[in-house]
Amino acid sequence: MFVWGASEFFSERSFFVILQKINRMRILQEVEKHIKVDAEIERFFYEECETRTIEKGKLLSEQNHYNRNIYFVEEGMLRMFYYENGKDITSNFYSEGKITANIDTIFKNELSKNNIETIEKSIITTCNYHKLEELCSVSLTAANF
């Protein structure tokens, strides 16, 4: 059991749900720096996104696979890299507050050319690109972002 305040008790699952909501609020605060968040955008972040803590060295996306997820880095660091002639080549790093995805899969419907891994313990919020497209079809604000 976790203690929240003097008299409120939450289970571990309830505590995790609260942390997810806090993380989604952080994303919404970042988005609000650029656009006015409408009800559909807010609903999207609460219902369609998932926040997870991921240990160092875990692959979020693998080269030569289809991956249509978008990754929001809440805490930690991601590395995008690929293998060429047996060599591990880093193409980019994504720190807190950054967004990444395998754009070759999302926009060209091709196998991913890159791997995405956590290079430290990270809190990542993900959403499926198809769900984001659905949001843009009902929210003019999101579509114009």
Predicted regions and their residues:
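Short phosphate-coordinating micro-motif centered on Lys-Gly-acidic
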Residues: L60-H65
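Glycine- and acidic-residue-biased ligand/ion/polar-headgroup-sensing regions
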Residues: G57, R68, F72-R79, E96-G97
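Cyclic-nucleotide recognition modules
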Residues: T90-F145
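Short hydrophobic targeting helices and cationic amphipathic motifs
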Residues: F10-S11, F16-L19
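Cyclic nucleotide-binding regulatory module and flanking cytosolic helices
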Residues: I18-E50, T105
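Short beta-strand segments in beta-sandwich/barrel cores
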Residues: E50, L59, M77-Y82, I99, ...
